[in-house]
Amino acid sequence: MNLFTEIRSLVTAELGAMAEAGELPAGLDLSAVAVEPPRDPAHGDMATNAAMVLAKPAGKPPRAIAEALATRLAADPRILSAEVAGPGFLNLRLRPAVWQGLVARVLQAGDAYGRSTIGAGQRVNVEFVSANPTGPMHVGHVRGAVVGDALARLLVFAGWDVTREYYINDGGAQVDVLARSAYERYREAHGLEPEIREGLYPGDYLIPVGEALKAKYGDSLLDKGEHCWLTDVREFATEMMMQMIREDLAALGVEMDVYSSEKALYGTGKIEAALQRLQDMGLIYEGVLEPPKGKTPEDWEPREQTLFRSTAHGDDVDRPVKKSDGSWTYFAPDIAYHYDKVTRGFDQLIDIFGADHGGYVKRMKAAVAALSDGRVPLDIKLIQLVKLWKNGEPFKMSKRAGTYVTLRDVVEQVGADVTRFVMLTRKNDAALDFDFDKVLEQSKENPVFYVQYANARINSVLRKAREQGMDVADAALACADLDRLDHPAEIALIAKLAEWPRLVEIAARTNEPHRIAFYLHELSSDLHGLWNRGNDEPGLRFLQDDPVVSQAKIALARAVGVVICAGLGILGVTPVEEMR
């Protein structure tokens, strides 16, 4: 139920009629024809570029096409006017009945309004968070977790079959550091002084791990060489860290479908199989890379290595996959992991990475393009840093983690709902300021409060109407005398509701869930604006002396509430019915 799609269908149907009448050549490609909100609302309700994109293939001036199309469109009962602007743009105004009818359609559809089928039949894997299992999640992980989970919810809303996945980085040197750090806490649990050397993890969160190791192993690991305990302690500590991470994610309202282990790729032939596939395609060779400019990456060697010809698929330089000593680079298991996702049959892959992984984007896209023969697109979203503020000062420390602010620090102070919404108030690749004081302010400068307050206002109107004996069930409101909604401010609010299905599809196609938060703020602003105008213009108040008029206005308010709740659901935020 997308009004823009419906009007576009009308436009393309009339273009087809023009072709049949000989006014346009037959067989024109209409895929670039769009119907969108105009840049300036004063110009109309919708605008189409049809004449502009068809002028060249049709061999006609765009204005001539636009004028002929305008005449045809004006004859449709939904169109109030069709006016040609500039060189050939066409601005459309819809009749009030179209907007009024949309309110009923929203109420009849309920939370299905705005849902789409554009992703139907397509499987997408969204990998996000994938934090090293070495400690509590920090505030940077929070933003990635929220963006990834909101994106997954958005894609489900738009029809995709979504798998949420976490890649456990348990195959590298950092889990050995974790084991050594946990062992010192194990010694501490036995009353010995821990030796938290430079390079080990200092946080208090490892104290319970040490105590758990003591409970399981007693003193059997004391005074033993590292080779005797490293493997057992590493696996034990990693599992405890993953349990902590799962609990952190749950506190934020995030639940993964799949946890994949990097360690499981080693010794199983999966890395070898992925690289063999690239080898069979002629994309693996032995060579020496030119020394890089600037900072030297850790996988560069001034000697022959096994290289992936990633430049064949858009990368800037070829990438090492095996070092001269025969060990794998960090990139090799990542190739194998993404090949595993390709072989699981996903139609699309999405990775949510921290901004520090920017140098990984081209090589990873090259690998997936090669391994899938270009069939499976990989979209990588980079998450920029979050700067924390409290009492007007940077907020940096956490006793629990030792060096950084944890997810729990944030959620315990402001709650999961506020945290999630604020993390989506900027595009993922823009830095974000998170002020613990401002996100709890009850002011219109606080987008979380502003949207929730709009929903609370709507619910207050519904409660008062019920107290007056009015039937405010959606079915009853959908049958209200909606032609009473004739004020330009009311029509403008309905027009904003009409944008919701289109906005959902755009956000889903671009993998940008922040668009939902932006839209909710705009919709709430329009609702508040109409509400506040009622203070000076009694005719705009939602509750009137005439119950017929009241029911129509309440129907509009309820329709706004339906969309706000649907949008908050995509963001993973619980709607508030009453501000406290």
Swiss-Prot record:
SMART domains: Arg_tRNA_synt_N, DALR_1. GO terms for biological process: arginyl-tRNA aminoacylation. It is found in: Cytoplasm. Gene3D superfamilies: Arginyl tRNA synthetase N-terminal domain, HUPs, Isoleucyl-tRNA Synthetase, Domain 1. A motif ('HIGH' region) lies at residues 131-141. GO terms for molecular function: arginine-tRNA ligase activity; ATP binding. Monomer. This is Arginine--tRNA ligase.
